[in-house]
């Protein structure tokens, strides 16, 4: 049992109220002006925000098969440090969770080592990127969160349509990394100013938006919940907006780096600035911000993608795609958008908690009496510089190194257990 004393909580109007919070038996037992108990542990939250634990539906934990990049343990420790209490693990592992046996093995490993809640995706196709569909029913029984071939767009419309029909029959979501391979052209960055300046092959916007346009029509025909991963282009935002207006069951996420950065921020041919989708144009970034504010884009997800140093500290042509994000998402977004009065604090918290929960019907994301005690304590005055040497993640690959941010998680509770406390050893 914990009592969080003298903290602040956000009410429905977005105003801060001084409250104590009692955690008992893994639940939020009481939220009141003052709580006095004779047993349990007191946590001093004076002047700090007590918020629901963050939810990230797009995380690469790399285990099994990529433990040199990340493990379930290190990835969930990083999540806890970043304030995340629920993360959804992508299936680009070795082996791929494309069968009940592999999924059962993964679930056992999660139960054994995870510091926070991990909801694993199953793949759509066997081995990722094939045309053979997995056994959807068996994988749902084994606890799959949803189905995705993340990292690889499903290339054939017929394959995707059949997958959507099977997912719809089970009331499960299809989650899509949208990329038409015939339009990538071997690109490593956005097909724009930076690519031209550096003489690099570019990935055009249409590689993403064309597949989203195809898929929303398939989702309409199949009656499926279709979710777009890491949306990055103005055309994609337009397609999703039109689909929502047409009543199609489509949701979309955006990553912090696509909201904060664009291609003109890239300092040079540095593998730590290589991600997929790539940093796009200023016009694309503006469209993403507009889409998030008007509800076209539903929430924020990090696409945390750790790699070993030797896979990133090389030119872009040789580097792996992806950057880490779990430990820096909140401070970066708070600094860039809340402190600048572009967003309210409540908007940011909602996009990291209740919005993803609502999209995927998860019973998390709210701080209220009776709720699961997934909680992050945030020091909105704490200022610190992003230093990969301090990361709990094995991945140190971030373009934000050296940036000073304000507003950091200082404690995280997952199902009532203190899983991160600032200042304690890793």
Curated annotation (Swiss-Prot):
GO terms for biological process: 'de novo' UMP biosynthetic process; purine nucleobase catabolic process. Pathway: Pyrimidine metabolism; UMP biosynthesis via de novo pathway; (S)-dihydroorotate from bicarbonate: step 3/3. Its cofactor is Zn(2+). Binds 2 Zn(2+) ions per subunit. Substrate binds at residues 60-62, 92, 276, 307, 321-322. HAMAP family: PyrC_classI_B. This is Dihydroorotase. It comes from Listeria innocua serovar 6a (strain ATCC BAA-680 / CLIP 11262). The lineage of its organism: Bacteria, Bacillati, Bacillota, Bacilli, Bacillales.
């Amino acid at each position: 049992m914990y009592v969080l004393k003298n903290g602040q909580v956000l009410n429905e109007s977005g105003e801060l109220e001084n409250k104590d919070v009692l955690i008992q038996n893994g639940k939020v037992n009481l939220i009141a002006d003052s709580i006095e108990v004779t047993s349990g542990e007191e946590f001093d939250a004076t002047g700090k925000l007590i918020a629901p634990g963050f939810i990230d539906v797009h995380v690469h934990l790399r285990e099994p098969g990529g433990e040199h990049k990340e493990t379930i343990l290190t990835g969930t420790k990083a999540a806890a440090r970043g304030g995340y209490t629920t993360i959804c693990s992508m299936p680009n592992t070795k082996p791929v969770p494309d069968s009940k046996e592999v999924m059962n093995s993964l679930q056992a490993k999660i139960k054994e080592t995870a510091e926070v809640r991990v909801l694993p995706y199953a793949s759509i196709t066997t081995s990722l990127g094939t045309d053979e569909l997995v056994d959807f029913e068996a994988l749902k029984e084994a606890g799959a969160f949803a189905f995705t071939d993340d990292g690889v767009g499903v290339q054939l419309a017929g394959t995707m349509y059949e997958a959507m029909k099977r997912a719809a029959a089970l009331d499960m979501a299809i989650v899509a990394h949208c990329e038409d391979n015939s339009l990538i052209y071997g690109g490593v960055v956005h097909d724009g100013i930076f690519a031209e300046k550096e003489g690099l092959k570019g990935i055009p916007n249409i590689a993403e938006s064309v597949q989203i346009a195809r898929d929303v029509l398939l989702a309409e025909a199949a009656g499926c919940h279709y979710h777009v991963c890491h949306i990055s282009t103005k055309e994609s935002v337009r397609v999703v907006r039109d689909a929502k207006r047409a009543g199609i069951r489509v949701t979309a996420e955006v990553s912090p780096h696509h909201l904060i950065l664009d291609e003109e921020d890239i300092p040079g041919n540095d593998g730590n600035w290589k991600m997929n989708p790539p940093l796009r144009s200023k016009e694309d970034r503006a469209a993403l911000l507009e889409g998030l504010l008007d509800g076209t884009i539903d929430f924020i997800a990090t696409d945390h993608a750790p790699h070993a140093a030797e896979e990133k500290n090389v030119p872009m042509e040789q580097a792996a795609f992806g950057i880490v994000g779990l430990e820096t998402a909140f401070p970066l977004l708070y600094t860039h958008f809340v402190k600048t009065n572009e967003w309210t604090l409540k908007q940011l918290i909602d996009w990291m908690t209740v919005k993803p929960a609502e999209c995927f019907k998860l019973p998390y994301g709210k701080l209220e009496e009776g709720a699961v005690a997934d909680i992050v304590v945030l020091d909105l005055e704490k200022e610190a510089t992003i230093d990969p040497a301090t990361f709990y993640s094995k991945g140190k690959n971030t373009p934000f190194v050296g940036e000073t941010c304000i507003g950091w998680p200082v404690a995280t509770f997952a199902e009532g257990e203190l899983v991160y406390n600032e200042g304690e050893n890793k």
